[in-house]
Amino acid sequence: MSVSAFNRRWAAVILEALTRHGVRHVCIAPGSRSTPLTLAAAENPAFIHHTHFDERGLGHLALGLAKASKQPVAVIVTSGTAVANLYPALIEAGLTGEKLILLTADRPPELIDCGANQAIRQAGIFASHPSQTLSLPRPTQDIPARWLVSTIDNALAMLHAGALHINCPFAEPLYGDMNDTGLVWQQRLGDWWQDEKPWLREARRRESDKQRDWFFWRQKRGVVVAGRMSAEEGKKVAQWAQTLGWPLIGDVLSQTGQPLPCADLWLGNAKAVTELQQAQIVVQLGSSLTGKRLLQWQATCEPEEYWVIDNIEGRLDPAHHRGRRLVAKIADWLELHPAEKRKPWCVEIPRLAELAWQRVVAQRDTFGEAQLAHRIRDYLPEQGQLFVGNSLVVRLIDALSQLPAGYPVYSNRGASGIDGLLSTAAGVQRASAKSTLAIVGDLSALYDLNALALLRQVSAPFVLIVVNNNGGQIFSLLPTPQSKRERFYLMPQNVHFDHAAAMFNLRYHRPENWEELELALASAWRTPATTLIELVVNETDGAQTLQQLLAQVSHL
């Protein structure tokens, strides 16, 4: 019997089973122990293959692919610390709902805890963070192929959101010519190999029913809070709220068009908070809210009912309101709960939103970080998409900009880390093949710098704007000790990104005014290549501008 040949047949069943559940993208890191999985993926024509030498970046690449494709994405890595490097992307997927299937090669059981090289305890390594975990046995013909395929099918059928970790031990030899070893074992699956359906099909109904008292609540004074959702859902939510006459507080990720812009500014005004206290019901569609003032209001508001609608399971309400947690796709829920045409009940908030917007517009000519956030709408590629980084930049865009309704916006706002942002953006672009504008801070870019390798080949124009304010200026907004702030919080690195762009053969610009930025963008959108645009800005102006605007709007 050829161990290497049967390893490959075992792996081929696993990979073929994935195709029956919508997996088309497979992300592969180099490794020896993962050879059976890698070769099975390489030989399966149903897959689009992506490779990267860094497993942490590979996991985030898969995360971006899953975000844009809305399909599960597979990841193949070898044993050892390669597995642990998938942890950040797995955690993010668990919080934002993207489906990742992590195929981790492993040493066989007899090589664990005995000093064997590159052998760690991989079973259960991710603790409670995966939605599903599957520890397969060592490949053996004593286990029928139908057990293997039905086990994979069952795990994928139960995967509603987040990651499925499949640990796959393989014994040596890992290399060798294919022969007939295991062919009969494999052929016992019959015409399944020519079919397109799973071996085991399970129907799972889990969406919330129609709320029968909706006709009663839609006649009340309500507020709509829009969190993370798809572009199509964002447009529908905006129309739904407008028909109801309810104010819509739209997060930067809501894609609703934010009809009441600058919410994170005007929510700091006591008049707005007082008017919102009249709301009898708050309907929150989507999770992952960004704005600090929005989160503060959400934590203190006390409507009669607080409903949270999201396709992800779990509470999703850190304020623990009395109300309803409804698990459903937002578009489906809106269809079951139509709006009734009513006049707007809020008067003060639209006025405050307009005045706040005017204050922001008055400062747009200065070349700086806050002004870029406000202007970002003008720089979006036509028929394209936006990827927003974390820390200060996403807060500035949320507070100071008004993105178009239905324009695709992506980010990693689950755990909200700055790791893997460039890799995630690369995955979003690969899955959608759209022109992409990504904007991150300098520390975020440094953290994921080797992901620039993923941006060397793109199918459409990709612009990466690195806002270089020399450190983690988000901490300037927090009451960090002044004497310790620079060394222990901001950590300025005093670097520029021209050499990084050159190392990966990317186009590079460092504009010093708006005209130069617009010329660089105009050139970038004409070519299917990556352009890195570094905006060197005053270190503290972005945070200070936000604080000044908050103070101004609070006294309107």
UniProtKB/Swiss-Prot annotation:
Species in which this protein is naturally found: Salmonella arizonae (strain ATCC BAA-731 / CDC346-86 / RSK2980)
Disulfide bonds: none
Family of this protein: Belongs to the TPP enzyme family. MenD subfamily.
Cofactor binding comment, as recorded: Binds 1 thiamine pyrophosphate per subunit.
Pathway participation: Quinol/quinone metabolism; 1,4-dihydroxy-2-naphthoate biosynthesis; 1,4-dihydroxy-2-naphthoate from chorismate: step 2/7; Quinol/quinone metabolism; menaquinone biosynthesis
InterPro entries named in the record: MenaQ_synth_MenD, MenD_middle, THDP-binding, Thiamin_PyroP_enz_TPP-bd_dom, TPP_enzyme_TPP-bd
Entry keyword set: Magnesium, Manganese, Menaquinone biosynthesis, Metal-binding, Thiamine pyrophosphate, Transferase
Cofactor needs: Mg(2+); Mn(2+); thiamine diphosphate
Catalytic activity as recorded in UniProt: isochorismate + 2-oxoglutarate + H(+) = 5-enolpyruvoyl-6-hydroxy-2-succinyl-cyclohex-3-ene-1-carboxylate + CO2
Complex formation: Homodimer.
Pfam name, any one: TPP_enzyme_C
Any GO molecular function: manganese ion binding
Function: Catalyzes the thiamine diphosphate-dependent decarboxylation of 2-oxoglutarate and the subsequent addition of the resulting succinic semialdehyde-thiamine pyrophosphate anion to isochorismate to yield 2-succinyl-5-enolpyruvyl-6-hydroxy-3-cyclohexene-1-carboxylate (SEPHCHC).
Name by which UniProt lists this protein: 2-succinyl-5-enolpyruvyl-6-hydroxy-3-cyclohexene-1-carboxylate synthase
GO biological process: menaquinone biosynthetic process
EC number: 2.2.1.9
